[in-house]
Amino acid sequence: MPFSGELVHGAWLHWLRCAAPDVATWLHDGNRRRFFTCSSLQFPVSQQRALEAERENVHLPLDPQQVYVVRITLLLGELFPLFYAALMRFNASGTESGNAPCMQIGRQLFRLEEVVLNNDDPSGWTGFTSLSSLVEKTKRLRLSSVQPLTLEFASLTTFNRNNMRSKSYGPHYARLPLPQYVFPGLLRRWEDIAPPELAHVVQRELIEQYIQDDGVIVTDYDLRTHRLKFTTHQQQGFIGTCKYHLRDSDEGMHSALSLRQQLLLLAQLAFYCGVGYKTSMGMGRTRPLEML
């Protein structure tokens, strides 16, 4: 199928379960938020063709001579050595048996060519950092009175609005990246993964009030609706870019960062955790386009 996010999600957990079953169980079980994201299988075709195939649910042929990419992010530092150890064990078992490490996505078997995690890959979608490094980097930012921020939503993004206070009309999927949808979700993810010494850096009440007071506004966008097919249902959403202005209000009370710096910190976090619904199944792949 042209969109394989849920299949990649399952394949990744199955691969990890074979190499490190305790880690896979910890990641999958319970009601905790996912501490990883997975992309759909990315084909070596133009973005336009890939999006058209998703929208029309047109299957793209696989060529054994081509290289296909899966992007996986790990949101806890403790997961990296576990992933590395699992990869080495899998590599050793593959060498002994004469088979290269592989992952089965649906009915297709893929051989692992390489793992890329450096910060300067031409794709612009790889990298590594720590939360403390992100905080220190953000501290050094010098902001204008109206600070621009552009986010690219590269895969289908939507927001599951089933937690609204009013249940009169039932849940729905929001298809616009309004500030009140984007930043509170990133704030919650920060609270999920930040250690105690960094949890206070992002101030929930101040950010929520700042957004409510229209401190963050949408000033430009290049968005379009999009749809894709999961195995059991069709999902609606959007893709594209959205430019925000963060207007001057830098009262970051009792925090290492000003209020607007906190929002820029969350924007950088979006590169790793994604935005919105089903980020562990290929949706919500996001990055800031400014050099933050």
In which residue ranges do the predicted regions lie?
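RNA-interacting cores
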Residues: 1-292
